[in-house]
């Protein structure tokens, strides 16, 4: 594996577009005069490329990873419908294959130049080799975590190689990370290549921390498949320096325009509406009040005592969302304080969070819901202005046409904050909160790691609050025992399970105030559904919120390996098509099963055509058919 690189079974394309001197190079990698180029150019081209230009970012980050992780509301891959066009583009010489080729070329070219004695003139080449190995390890995880076994190509020879199993890939990348981190030499002057390192500007100590944090992440990933190796690798990585502060973020600076550095969330037509998963996790979590100006505070409503309008004739009930059928006609008074910084209030342009990409706030108007017995006749009027709620996607069947004036407009949903859409941020690949939440999980598992589960959990929350400029609010938040919609509280020591209780709601059809028993969901794929407030659920609730909006593939991977946090089913007003959707039916719509969530995406269709033998070998290593429900080696089974 260490002499191979990932490749699609496609023709080799021209090489890169990078920056600085490397912009002048536009040749096949086999034909590049190696005396003209430096290994760091290949490394930086790979890092910058993986930032994703708008074409591939929309297809993979927004429409695939964000759907899989429930960062955004939507159907598509959320319900198991992958897109062959998206996947084919991603696993091509324009994108993922190129990035891996570039990373491997950086390793190989660096090794050749060192062997040829050039390290006497350019000693920093020795470190560039290790940096490229670390980055390649990440890329291998990014690609294989989506597909499973991936094809390999002997280094730039153009000859298709055999597929590697996920187990072999993970064994390789864990070894690579350990060796590369140990080989990095902080005493070497890296200033000659600092402009060619989009991550850390040549800071070797930061690369060492990134390597250790990444090894912690990937070791924990395989805890179900090889617990002994996972524990051994994790403990070793955790005993060294890891990303523990915001100054150590592994991140890439965005730039406006259309390039690899354009924000992955920049496309104006992508609504990026708040999902029910996110809403259920943050509403009621903590005792912090939603920050609204005095002029809008009349719209605050207590989510602990009030559910909203029960629109059972217009909203689907065929879901295990505990808020099924309800429309929250206001702003929840108590939410996780990070949530209002991430998603806008409907109809309120605060100048900071609200993005007019979804339409001007002034466009939000009262809408009609139509009569189920006569879908041309308005039955109810709903005013979405100054609300903060959402509802499941999926198959609404006839109910979809009755509520389309509400559900069919992007500006009727809380949507992703403007600041993340303007290409002015740094795209985060690894934050300090993740290191701490991984350590907290390891501690709960009884592993030998620094800090206690509680201290690491609280450090993770604190790091996330600091990222959002909310440090002053974290103290009260960490002591809160209030439950969110799932039945999880913040306080690490508060593990009492939430019980059903009576809440108020409004019947909009009769205009009556009524009560009902609110029942928390049963997450059957985690510990049999008996726990919503144990230590692990708290850790993964906080980890999920902290990873928004930058790390959707990681959240998807977490859910695939442990079943946390709770992911509700989307609406199933009619049975799903098992040929291109997860196998949900009306009868099973309220159940929680592993097969109701996509585990991977299918291989590009042209691989079957171009290399049937290799494709069949991949399926043999995968251990199942080429469908989204087939679990990867490390998945929860």
Where are these regions (language model features)?
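Flexible, polar/acidic helix-loop-strand segments at domain edges
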Residues: 311-444, 455, 459-462, 475, ...
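Short coil/turn linking the two alpha-helices of tandem helical-hairpin repeats
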Residues: 142-151, 221-227, 447-449
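Conserved, well-structured interaction surfaces
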Residues: 70-190, 422-427, 633-634
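Membrane-proximal, proline-rich intrinsically disordered regions
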Residues: 19-69, 355, 576-637
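Acidic/aromatic/glycine-rich contiguous surface patches that form carbohydrate-binding/processing clefts
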Residues: 447-528
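Bacterial Sec-dependent N-terminal signal peptides
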Residues: 1-27
